[in-house]
């Protein structure tokens, strides 16, 4: 069984130390997970960095930031999705690992989604991701987190900007084509709309101009013309994400198998659009702009034909508040994997799904706070889109 892992780093995992390796190995050895579907399924979760949902055309945004995805059939956008943290280490941790509504998770004794899939009979797992710049932390993080997924490969950008997410596409095509005959999970982890925005897309995707964005501090005049350049550049990152996701969908379509794609952003972004003119993310008091994230599903015709019930349940949950932690259990159900770690009340593909009544998030002060209120203006825009899609 082959696992190709190109990964990115987070110092927090490296600081946990090598002693975590033995604990994770013991957990992996005792995992139970079985694929029950007679169908051959290819699943592709895509973790995107830094994307505020209300800058997406699919959520009613006034700009065409999703011109390709907007034309896609079999695509379900979840407009009321919230993250669990406004910084990547905590938020992605709760996407890859099973977490409860109180946000509790211990990654040293909780199986990663990819590990459960790897344990399932006849299912392989591949993870391809962009990387951070510090190779020392990358190596430690990869050794600890992906220790049970076989061979590791590091694509590093030691002295230059991290390449745009389109660099993932050749690997995605190669892996999907090579595994088109079997159950397969491909995880893509991009850098999305993370700062510096102009580095996150090629020139051909600089459609909103001017976009010569530069960071100059947190205290600015709300009428400063430079703010619009920042917002233009951020919208260009979403335009590029639209291109990347549409390209992956085309690859999945071409393989002709039952397949699905799930995209979820780890957190949103402040671009001088809060009352106290915040910029970037990981603020000490989490904002709506950081909390409201993009979440979507795409399904092939073949998948819908054989798994219509699961797809219909996901559509039913478009109109209620959901959280990024739901992705873990939803993917397990879309793959029809049986494991004690599966919780149907946290799967959007289940009729037993329970709405999150008390949404919470970790903020930059490393504290849990209530999720910020959803602005009425944004809610009205989203509701109009949902009404038009009926």
Report residues per predicted region.
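Conserved beta-strand->loop/alpha-helix structural units within folded catalytic cores of enzymes
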Residues: 48-50, 241-244, 259-267
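Active-site-proximal cap/lid insertion segments
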Residues: 134-139, 191-251, 255, 277, ...
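Phosphate/adenylate-binding glycine loop and adjacent helical scaffold
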Residues: 329, 335, 339-390
